């Protein structure tokens, strides 16, 4: 059963990957799951468990409406914007696409915020 859309999974993957990259950049090492969850919550108010549940398609579709999920992911992406470089963003998009292409083929996915929002800051 598909609880979350591939596009929601794509955006969640990017959020997760960007948080990992920011953590690595600041700490100089890769985080464990607990460290990542604490870092995401303390620094960005991101519920990484929620993000992981979308990526892994674990959940109950009745729990949240599509618009609520997309709004939350959009907010997370916007929160990360000041801390992300174009290279970090492109790496995360490529990683997300590679992950999803194994499950859903080579579909095109859209961000819940515009690519331009990330590119303008460069």
Swiss-Prot record:
Gene3D superfamilies membership: Hypothetical protein YfmB (1.10.8.570)
Disulfide bonds: none
The protein, known as: Uncharacterized protein YfmB
Annotated source species: Bacillus subtilis (strain 168)
């Amino acid at each position: 059963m598909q609880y979350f859309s591939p596009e929601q999974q794509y955006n969640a993957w990017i959020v997760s990957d960007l948080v990992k990259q920011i953590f690595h950049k600041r700490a100089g090492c890769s985080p464990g799951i607990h460290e990542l969850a604490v870092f995401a919550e303390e620094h960005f108010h991101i519920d990484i468990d929620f993000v992981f549940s979308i990526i892994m398609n674990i959940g109950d579709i009745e729990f949240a409406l599509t618009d609520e999920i997309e709004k939350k992911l959009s907010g997370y992406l916007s929160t990360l914007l000041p801390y992300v470089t174009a290279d970090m963003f492109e790496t995360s998009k490529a990683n997300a696409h590679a992950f999803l292409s194994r499950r859903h083929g080579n579909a095109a996915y859209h961000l819940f915020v515009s690519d331009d929002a990330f590119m303008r800051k460069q």
